[in-house]
Amino acid sequence: MGNPLLDISAVVEQDILDKYDLQLNNAILAEEKHNPLYKEMVDKYPVEYIAGGATQNSIRVCQWMLKTKGATTFIGCIGEDDFGTQMTNACQADGVTTKYMIDKSTPTGTCGVLVKDGERSLIAALNAANNYKFEHLQEAENWKIVEDAKFYYSAGFFLTVSPDSMMAVAKHSAENNKCNMM
């Protein structure tokens, strides 16, 4: 479980970093002043879209290492939009099963990845990723995934999003002698 973010990555010029008060080798949460940044990146630079977020990145690497399609599952919240569709398709192409909760009122979370001279600046807009609900995890098909899994991984960021979900998985893993990693 974690915060799924669609990375929007581009090699940029210094002017866009200055315009949005961004520093290289830094990671921040987006503020209102950053809202136009993502569209500006798309309009001004060739961009690459990558399924991201700390936990989802780790799950994708694990899936790649295991080399068995569907060996991993990622749970989180996305918006009902093109970015959510792109992220779902990217994960499926990587062999990761996704069980996203769909938030119809909030856009999919994004992370601007601005690269200059081999260094980067990250600007995360959590959006729907911040809206995951415990009730989604409790749905029979999702809880079955928890029951069937042997290992669980989540970044600590998710504790602020759905502590009940984190505690339920921790309790299940402890009661069933399974490995829960954070």
Positions of PLM-derived features:
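A general structural signal for well-ordered alpha-helical segments in protein cores
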Residues: 55-59, 84, 166
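Short amphipathic alpha-helical segments at helix-loop
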Residues: 39-43, 71-72, 154
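Ribokinase/PfkB-type carbohydrate-kinase core domain
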Residues: 1-25, 47-50, 68, 77-79, ...
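Short catalytic helix/loop segments, enriched in acidic residues and glycine
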Residues: 15-43
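Active-site alpha-helical elements of protease catalytic centers
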Residues: 49-73
